[in-house]
Regions:
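Outer-membrane beta-barrel initiation region
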Residues: 1-64, 73-77
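Short loop/turn motifs that connect adjacent beta-strands in outer-membrane beta-barrel proteins
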Residues: 12-18, 31-34, 45-50, 79-82, ...
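Residues that define the transmembrane beta-barrel architecture of outer-membrane proteins
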Residues: 18-20, 34-38, 65-71, 96-100, ...
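Transmembrane beta-strand segments that form the barrel wall of outer-membrane beta-barrel proteins
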Residues: 20-30, 49-61, 71-73, 82-93, ...
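Residue-level signature of outer-membrane beta-barrel architecture
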Residues: 44-46, 75-77, 91, 106, ...
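Detector for outer-membrane/organellar transmembrane beta-barrel domains
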Residues: 97-157
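Flexible, surface-exposed loop regions and adjacent strand-edge segments
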Residues: 105, 133, 162-167, 203-210
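Outer-membrane beta-barrel "beta-signal"
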Residues: 173-179, 209-223
Length: 223
């Protein structure tokens, strides 16, 4: 209409303002394995592009207190209404190597949350992580969450107990109680892990168990 914005300038839409967030998707204890598991992510940016920092791993609470973690710094961008893409760099403490990473995260039909991430390490190793979970809401606060994770590698790495192909399957079922506007959710659950393919034979040769189950308890929260 030709009317100037005035001395305060052009108004800024909320979508143009950088925001930030932190999400702790898991901070829990795995009783039979005596370890603390964690999955943390933080982001800063706009609705259409963000910088994302993500770390997941475990800390042994007995013996040598080993720490296994996979940490990535990536550029995040929505690809569609239900899917987001990311690309960046990562570092894996288990094999002590950096990697280039790319992934896609989103919601499949029937509201199944899905993520797929690929890592190319400096030694040429390629790692693929696949994950899925579903929220079965029992009431306003109580939620049952089954989840599954699968990992695969492109070649053998004997030093790090890795074999070519699908290596490990992890599953867990949690009973969660959401409170404080769903920002805080303690849980109890049962987890199960099993080696796959050639990894089963390798573990047997080293007198290690090929599968294990454990009770878990922890909390997830965001702000």
């Amino acid at each position: 209409n030709g009317v100037p914005y005035g001395r305060y300038g052009q108004p800024m839409m909320m979508g143009d303002m950088p925001l930030w967030g932190v999400s702790v998707d898991d901070l829990g204890y795995q009783f039979d394995d005596d370890q603390i598991n964690y999955e943390v992510s933080a982001w800063y940016g706009l609705d259409e592009r963000r910088l994302s920092l993500r770390s997941e791993g475990s800390v042994q609470t007995k013996d040598e207190k080993d720490i296994d973690s996979l940490t990535s710094l990536s550029y995040w961008k929505p690809l569609s209404i239900f899917w987001n893409g990311e690309a960046g760099v990562a570092y894996d403490t288990k094999n002590d190597k950096p990697a280039i990473m790319a992934g896609i995260v989103g919601t499949m039909p029937y509201f199944i949350e899905t993520d797929a991430r690929a890592y190319l390490y400096t030694d040429g190793q390629v790692r693929l992580d696949l994950g899925a979970e579903y929220e079965w809401r029992l009431s306003q606060h109580w939620v049952v969450i089954p989840e599954v994770g699968l990992s695969a590698f492109s070649k053998d790495d004997i030093d790090n107990h890795i074999t070519k192909g699908f290596n490990e399957l992890e599953t867990e079922v949690r009973l969660t109680y959401e409170t404080l506007g769903r920002q805080l959710a303690p849980y109890v659950g049962v987890s199960y892990e099993t080696a796959l393919g050639s990894a089963r034979g390798q573990r047997r040769q080293e007198n290690e168990s090929v599968d294990s189950s454990s009770l878990t308890a922890g909390v997830k929260f965001w702000f």
